[in-house]
């Protein structure tokens, strides 16, 4: 777990449903004890948002070291697809199911520390 603290300094967590929001909240509480900086949290369960989700993901790819999606892997893959460029530069992308039982590293598993996050 110490490896996670050293490698991932900033990130964003995005959820799409009420169950995903509960899981994301629990996960972020656990991660906050291990990280130097807290993850940003975006709740996309409602209809009112300051930015379109595609724009948020684009900005996250440019600014964050890690993106956690709590929800369907298909949604995450479609959202990140336009921005994927290089395994050494892209942020770690992790998808966690809504119940919090399974974590799938999508990008930057070894290089970006995504595999380490998936074991928490």
What are these regions (language model features)?
Residues 16, 20-29, 50-51, 62, ...:
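Conserved mixed alpha/beta catalytic, RNA-binding, or beta-rich assembly cores of soluble enzyme
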Residues 3-4, 57-58, 83-84:
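Short, flexible, glycine/charge-rich loop motifs used to bind or transfer phosphoryl groups or to couple energy/partner
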Residues 2-43:
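N-terminal basic/disordered segments at the start of proteins
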Residues 41-60:
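N-terminal beta-loop-helix "entrance" segment that forms/cooperates
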Residues 120:
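Conserved small/polar residues in nucleotide/adenosyl-binding loops
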Residues 8-10, 60-65:
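Short, surface-exposed connector motifs at secondary-structure boundaries
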């Amino acid at each position: 777990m110490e490896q996670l603290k050293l490698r991932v300094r900033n990130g964003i967590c995005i959820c799409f449903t009420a169950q995903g929001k509960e899981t994301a909240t629990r996960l972020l509480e656990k991660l906050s004890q291990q990280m130097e900086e807290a993850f940003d949290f975006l709740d996309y369960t409602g209809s009112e948002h300051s930015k379109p989700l595609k724009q948020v993901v684009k900005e996250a790819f440019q600014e964050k070291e890690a993106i956690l999606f709590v929800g369907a892997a298909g949604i995450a893959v479609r959202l990140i697809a336009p921005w994927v460029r290089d395994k050494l530069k892209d942020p770690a992308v992790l998808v966690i199911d809504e119940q919090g039982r399974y974590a799938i590293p999508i990008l930057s598993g070894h290089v970006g520390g995504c595999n380490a996050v998936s074991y928490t």
